[in-house]
C-alpha cells in the first residue's frame, strides 16, 4: 500500500532531524579539536572552481526529500529510510573517529551562485570530509530513482554524475573523500539490497549452514510437481558437516589474510590507495565463507550480480575470470554426459549461445574467424574472452564435445561468485559456494531441479565456474537417482568419461550419497503412496 502523505512527511521530518543533528554534532566536535588534519593530493590544485555546480550540489537535497513521496509502498519507503539512516550513522561515526578538514579558500561568488554558497556556509563547516556523505547519498538516492523511473535512467545517471563531480568543483571535498564516500554508498546498497534479504540478516545455525536451501526449496517447488516429493521438514533437519564448516572457515581466513596483505601497499599512499578496493573485495568474499552464505554474492534470478556486489567485488571478479581462463585453457568448456544432460563452465554458455543457439552455424563460423584474428589482444579482456573460440587438442578428443550448432534449452547455474551471461533460453540459478562441499539440502534441490528442467525442456546444461566441482556434484547426484547408476563409483566413471578434470573430495562424495539416498527414499515413498491411493 502506498504510504500516506502524513506518514511520508513524518518519516522525512524524523530522518531530516537525524541528519542535521548528527551532521552538526560531528562538525562542531571537529571544530573543537586543536588539530584536524587535511589530506589532499598535489594534482588537486588543478581542479577548477565552477560556481554553477553548486546547483547540482544543492539538488541532492531536493531529490533526497522528494523520494519519500515517490515510494510505491511502505516496504520501499522503509528500505529507503534504512539506507539513508545507515549511511548517516556510519559516516558520522567516521567523521568523529577520523576528523578531516578542507582548508582551501573558495573564490568569491555573487548572484544566485553566491546566495547558494552563503546558504551552505550557514549550517556547514569545513569538516565532515571522509567518507563524503554527499557522494554516499548521491549513490543511495540515485539508486532509488534508477529503480523507480527506469525510462529516464540515462538522465538520472548523468545528473548523479554531475552531483558527484560538484563535490570537487565547489571546493567542498578533496579527492580522497570521493572513493571513500562511494564505498560507503555501495556498502549500504549491498547490506540493504533491492531484492532479497540482507546478508547480515540471514539466520544460521551453529553448524554453519544458512537456511538458503529451505528458502530456495519453497520457491522452486512452485515450478515443478516433482519438488513435492521431498518434505520441507527434511530440509530443516540436514546441516553442514563439521568438516565442511571447518573448510569454510579456513578459506575465509585465507581471504582475510589476502585482504590484509592487499591493504599493506596503501601505506605508501598515492595510487597504491586503490589497493584498498582489492582488500574490500576479498573481505566480502571472506564474509561469504565465514557465514557459509552464498547469498553474499547477491546473484539474481537472471544470473547477474547486484550492482552493489559487482562494484564491491570487481577486483575479485577479475581474478575469477583470469582463474577460469587459466584452468580452461586448451580444454573443452562444456561436455555431454548424456544426450539430455550436459556439464560445463559458466563461460561456455555464452560461447554456445552466441556461436550457435542465436546466430546459426554459418554466421557463427564467420564471426569466429573474424574474432580469431584479434584473439591475442581480446583474450586479456575478461568481458570479451568468453566469446572467443577455443581450439585445442583436448577439445577435439573430448568424447562428447558440445558442437557449436547444439541448442541449449535450459541452464542450471550453481556458480555463486560469477555473473551468468545474458541468456535467451530457460535459465535457473542455485548459487553454491566454491571449494567447499555442497550441503545435502543443496544437492537434493539441485538434482530435483535438474530433473524437472530435463523433463520440461529436453536438455539441460549444469554449470559452475569451471565445470569440475559443484556442477559435477549435482550431475553425480542426478545420475544416482535418475540416471540409472547403481552406485557412486559407476556414476563417477561415467562422468569422468565426459569431464576427465572433475574433482570429487570425500566430503562431497558423502553429501552426494546422502542426498541421493534421501531422494530415492522420497521417490519410493511417493510411489507407494500412489499405489495405495
What are these regions (language model features)?
Residues 113-120, 325-381, 385-390, 394-462, ...:
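Cysteine-based protein phosphatase catalytic domain of the PTP/DSP
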Residues 1-4, 197-214, 221-224, 229-232, ...:
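Membrane-interfacial, low-structure loops and terminal tails that flank and connect transmembrane helices
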Residues 137-138, 173-193, 309:
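Alpha-helical transmembrane segments that form the membrane-embedded catalytic/substrate-binding core
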Residues 30-43, 70-154, 160, 164, ...:
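Membrane-interface loops
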Residues 20-21, 88-96, 159-171, 258-264, ...:
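Aromatic-anchored segments of alpha-helical transmembrane domains
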Residues 61-67, 136-143, 159-166, 255-263:
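Hydrophobic, membrane-inserted alpha-helices
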Residues 196, 208, 241-321, 325, ...:
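PTP/DSP superfamily signal
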Residues 1-63, 107, 117, 214, ...:
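N-terminal transmembrane-helix/juxtamembrane module of multi-pass inner/ER membrane proteins
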